[in-house]
Amino acid sequence: MAERAHTPARWLAAAAGLLLLVAAPAVAGPLDGPGYTKALACSACHGQGGNSRTEATPVLAGMPTWYFKKAIEDYASGRRLSPEMEPFAKMVRQLGVDDVAAYFAAQPREKLALEIDRAAAARGRTAARPCAACHGEDGYGDERRGIPSLRGQPPGYLRNQLLLFRADRRSPGEPALVSVKAMLKSFDDATLADLAAYYASLGR
């Protein structure tokens, strides 16, 4: 669910996922069920079972249903801008977002299969101290307050999202995020990269 420039290769991969969705055979065992079939189109970018293997694409495996559904609604409605994600969010909403959200929430989350800069992660741990007030010491977030987990997401994805928040290009004008964006404006690009490395390292 990344707001970034799309490429022809990624569109082809996503199109392949749509073809799988249409032509998917019956699957027995733990993959059986409506959520699995409906989520096939997502796997082209987000990986098998939602375990992303790329820097800029988030992990969906183990994602709480409330946050997955919020993200889909935000993309589909245009509140979260992404020409790449908007049509897929609308498709997921039409197919049945509850089934897809439940499928990804039930998937085991694998250790992040990406290299993490240890020195950057160490610096990021220090920089993340003010973030812990909302996201928790270990980055798990707080569902009761609508605060998502940050831990174990790819560093490239986290960095991109932090840059978007800092520039007020994600959730623009949302009152609950005013203080967050003000804090991020005090961080330079290198510090945001360190923060991303730290939270990504929690998934190793």
Where are these regions (language model features)?
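Axial heme c-ligation environment in periplasmic c-type cytochrome domains
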Residues: 53-59, 75-108, 112-117, 144-149, ...
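Bacterial N-terminal signal peptides that target proteins for export
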Residues: 2-15
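The feature marks the first
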Residues: 32, 37-77
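Disulfide-stabilized extracellular ectodomain repeats and their linkers
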Residues: 39-42, 57, 65, 82, ...
